[in-house]
Amino acid sequence: MKFFSSLTALLLSLATLGAAQAQPLRVGVTPGSLADSAQIAAREAKAQGLDVQIVEFTDWTLPNTALVNRDLDLNYYQHQAFLDTFNRENRQDLRAVAVGSRGNIGIFSKRYKSLASLPTGASVALANDTSNQARAIATLRDAGLVTLRANAPQLAQIDDIASNPKKLKFIEVAGPQLARALDDADITVVSLGGLLQAGQLETARQGLYYSVGTDAFWAIHFVTRADNVKDARVRQFIDIYQQSQAVRQQIHASYANESRFYSLPWLK
């Protein structure tokens, strides 16, 4: 009798495991180069026996919320600073498990042709969330428009500005809406990906300043829950993404075939 009980338990366990493995790997992304390249990787994964469901979000918080709620197994849309801020503010422990593409950002304008021509009191649109505002402030600093106080944190905010010679006026905007702010502000600090997603290719090519690099901190990361880090499907999908020539070609195409608009830090 014990043998049959043990056999039944084993069969139930195997059935449960099989059902879990039969579920698709659910990956949350945002539209544009991330979604397009993830779809390519998903098709290649399918050919290798891994079923992947790509779920698109236009909100910058929902992919993490969905991951916490187990509606996703993995997301691919945020850099390390954004993840750190989310974990701190929401008392979560989401983990970055691999690095993806790094979209560059810059300073753009529909009203002025150079930073030197900016008038005193010019308006600047930048992200209102902590991590992306920090990247914008760093870009303004590197462009020579502002300086920061000596003890400013890595994620410096507007309040950390020490000098502002042109008396720039800051307009804080939700990240997904930054490309639209080009019509309302004198200059906008926005990602190249955001501009391209909004159909602003010519504006993207005529930046007043570009912040480029290959460091992984501002790259987009693959993120999962702490209890899901060892999921073999997650590792398999990431390996496919990083090794696929078709994925790299799609990223290049998504960035209008402009190598200066992005980098692939995992190739360093």
What is each residue range found by the language model?
Residues 28-53:
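Short, polar/charged alpha-helical segment
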Residues 55-65, 152-180:
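Short helix-initiation/N-cap motifs at beta->coil->alpha
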Residues 97-147, 248:
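A conserved helix-loop-strand patch within extracytoplasmic ligand-binding domains
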Residues 7-16:
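Bacterial N-terminal signal peptides
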Residues 32, 56-60, 70, 74-84, ...:
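Beta->alpha turn/N-cap motifs
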